[in-house]
């Protein structure tokens, strides 16, 4: 399918075009896309079955700014470059018809700074945690003392990955609560989760994930 560029993201028509941003003195920005989507995976189901594949594990597919998508911008929406929520359901249905299960990568330790939750650059029409303490997402994030003032905590110091607070009732309800993100993903047909940086999630948050999964399976 034809993919329409989103702000600050680039679609390449062939593998030989150089990346738009970098590498330079600031490194390489992961915003260059070369295609590939959920529909393409669905179209290969019969081939995968012939290889005796029984599980399809997908790295993050939610809307994000980067190619790796470990910087979630919106957990409720499949990244338009990967497809749609309906496309995910279609893939899961096709997998199940062919004796396969689908596992998603759950990235719940942090979001992206360019997200509807943090919204550092004002990309989204939401009041982000970066913008105001009045944001409905403000309590999603960890805060620490930094040089005598209260600041957000970032995963391994990476300023594009603000850390979420696993003890925050608001964050827990959004991800773990009834009708929350995990429920929404399972409603689309997924069979399980792989947890990113699980060692950095709180025990109680992991237990909450376990309960949410059992509620759906």
State each model region's role.
Residues 57-60, 196:
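Residue-level recognition of beta-strand->loop/alpha-helix junctions
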Residues 103, 192-198:
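Short catalytic-loop micro-motif centered on adjacent basic/acidic residues
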Residues 2-54, 61-188, 209-214:
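Substrate-binding/active-site clefts of carbohydrate-active enzymes
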